[in-house]
Each structure stands twice: as C-alpha cells, then as structure tokens.
C-alpha cells in the first residue's frame, strides 16, 4: 500500500526479521509469537479503529477489542499487538480466530505502545514504552 493511501493515524508496525539464531544478552527482549493477526489499535478521542498490518480497517471484524480499547483511560493512543482467540486448553487457536463463531471472542495481546496522548513514543526505549503500556492497561 502506498504511504499516501494509508488511513489517518495509521502507524506502520515494525516487522520481525528471521535470523538463524535468536539474539542473546541482557539488552534483548523476546516476545512470544502467537497464532494471531497483527493489529494496530488507534484511539483518537471517542473513535477507535483497528487496522491489519497492511492498513485494512478491521474494526467491525474485532468488536470486542475495539470496545475494550474504548474503555481505556486515555484520550489517544496507538497500540501494537496481536488479536487472538484463546482455546479451552489456554493456547491460541488461529482457526477459531479465522472463523470466530458465536463463542469465539478475540482478545488483544498488546506488546507495544507507539503513541500516547498525542505523543509519539517510538523513539523512547522499549522498556519505557512497555511500562507506560502496563499503566494504561491496568
């Protein structure tokens, strides 16, 4: 998608890069990769929109996530995360996410806070963003 065609407020998420071996050392953070859809959640005032990593509006497809984001106590933010359906065994279930039947509710596993109350946080250290994210979600 051309940048000029991106929706207002959309932030292009960072993409993982495959390596032969994971990095090691105290400066690295490792995240679990779930069977999920990558989602950018953008709230601006009362309006909440969910986007796929390719900037497709998924708000209507994931209403529980949009409703939950609307209840957070912030006037604006952009979250990066993964929409998942957790099965009865506690594991993410990608097929349930794809079909989302009447009993399958998608939830967001948020792992980064890119913008918060009109401030771009992407240049801040990841640890700081994660601390702010935890505060927003609590």
Summary of predicted features, one role per range:
Residues 1-138:
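Catalytic cores of nucleic-acid ligases and guanylyltransferases
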């Amino acid at each position: 998608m051309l940048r000029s065609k991106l929706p207002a407020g959309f932030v292009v998420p960072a993409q993982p890069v495959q390596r032969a071996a994971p990095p090691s050392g105290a400066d690295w953070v490792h995240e679990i990769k779930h069977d999920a859809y990558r989602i950018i959640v953008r709230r601006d005032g009362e309006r909440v929109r969910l986007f796929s990593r390719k900037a497709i509006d998924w708000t209507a497809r994931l209403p529980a996530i949009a409703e939950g984001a609307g209840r957070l106590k912030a006037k604006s933010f952009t979250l990066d995360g993964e929409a998942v359906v957790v099965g009865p065994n506690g594991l993410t279930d990608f097929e349930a996410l794809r079909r989302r039947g009447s009993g399958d509710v998608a939830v967001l596993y948020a792992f980064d806070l890119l913008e918060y109350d009109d401030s771009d946080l992407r240049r801040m250290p990841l640890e700081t963003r994660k601390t702010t994210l935890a505060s927003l979600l609590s």
